[in-house]
Amino acid sequence: MYYELSKHKMITCFSKHYDVSEYPEDLNREYYMISTGINENDWKKLVSVMKKLHAKFICVDVANGYMKKLVEFVKRVRASWPDVVIVCGNVVSREMVEELIINGGADIVKVGIGSGSVCTTRIQTGVGMPQLSAVAECSDAAHGIDGAIISDGGITCPGDVAKAFGGGADFVMLGSMLAGHTESAGEVIEENGEKYKVFYGMSSSTAMNKYHGGVANYRSSEGKTVKLKYKGSVENTVMDILGGVRSTCTYIGANRVKDIPKCCTFMRVNRQVNTIHNGKEV
């Protein structure tokens, strides 16, 4: 996936479950970020990975960013590698964005709780915030203190990418839109003549069984595992996304992505698209 996305100057965020030996040697540091959790074993692995790669971007990745331990870990990363770009999250409110940037030393905050397509956090816990509202609030906070945000979750089509930029996001993270392709992780499976790929959330029982030896008896799964129709090469999807955002810019008069928030207006609607001929495509 990295090799295909980097052709379009898109950044690949490697999973924090990657072992040191799994990282290729020929990575362009402009187009990938390594990820880490916040426990001591995560720190030891991060040190080993940085010795091998000297990465430009480090993503401190936890489902619940409202922890003092996250802020302290980000401080530790900043002290050890003063020149790296630190990404951390996830959060959905102004106060925590300011805490992570001002006191933690983060450069970019990842925004989104419960909005992912294979996330069930809002069902299991009742916790979350509508993604566009979170992006608008958090980007306003970050930009006021020379920081940036990534909108993480809730993207279903190229138009959603454009809306995330319109809400103030500096970056947009994609999961399900890039799943199910040749370059995506997992084997292609065939059933009744149709090809599929399995896609699962990182808080699902599938992920916890794979990486943590099962779901701990004090918690529940907060993700699901789904079977997606095989989509072929990711190149087609990437070109569709980029083409959609370019067209957004022409419709609203934005000369560049950075101008989208200044050129767009959001309106609340009951129906976004006309669906009268859905299912009749040829």
Predicted regions and their residues:
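Active-site entrance/lid segments in N-terminal catalytic domains of soluble metabolic enzymes
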Residues: 1-148, 176-181
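Alpha/beta catalytic cores of nucleotide-metabolism and tRNA/nucleoside-modifying enzymes
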Residues: 104, 126-151, 155-282
